[in-house]
Amino acid sequence: RQYQFFFCQLDAMETLIWLVEAPDAEKVGIDIPSDGGAFRRICTKLCTGGGKTTVMAMLIAWMVCNKATYPQDKRFSKYIFIVAPGLTVRSRLQVLQTGGADNYYAQFGVVPVGLMDKLRQGKVMITNWQALAWETDEAIAKRKSVDKRGAKSDEAYVREVLGEMANAQNIVVINDEAHHAWRRNPQNKGKTKEEKEAEKQATIWVSGLDRINKARNILCCYDFSATPFAPSGKKNDEEALFGWIVSDFGLNDGIEAGLVKTPR
């Protein structure tokens, strides 16, 4: 190949594939904790510089090409919904659009030329977490305008958020910088302004996905982050790690592999 994938990228992707394609007999005893929600989350911990975006491209290619080849296989989906933490990241993720001029699938040889037509059968939507926000009944009650329409139903909400993908079912969600997406712990409320803002963002992000899952079903939610921690109120950060991490290539690993420059 012209472009060799990093070991950490292959390790991450092979783990995700194995969790779906391996026989159940091989997965006996493996129990991946839930985040407490109704849809499944899987987290890949990969340090900055480890190539998370390329792994996302590999994940999308694997999902879409398999679904295009085996339409009846419910383990796969051709509908990909990517949530970014900001406009800058969202712009950077445009390389995951299958028809883009600078797409990673062709640029890094993720998909052979002969399979590009199958890949293009998929639909990839990239949005910002703010797009998941909606007005609650409480917020509507405080509205001073004459517009007193109630909160949107899940169906209306999903149609607005998903747009051209509104009729999709069994959607694969990819959370980039997923440490911004966690379920609020009632026993650990944010105290500072920054903590309250982080809590608000996390609540909007995850609750929005809950509504999408309720109306359209989320096949699986794949989290990517270099720092997948959620506030726990405990002094030991390790206790705040996402419980659903399935592969871990941290900062020290990245430095040893030469993917990350040694801090001075």
Language model features: what each stretch is:
Residues 1-264:
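RecA-like P-loop NTPase motor core of helicase/translocase proteins
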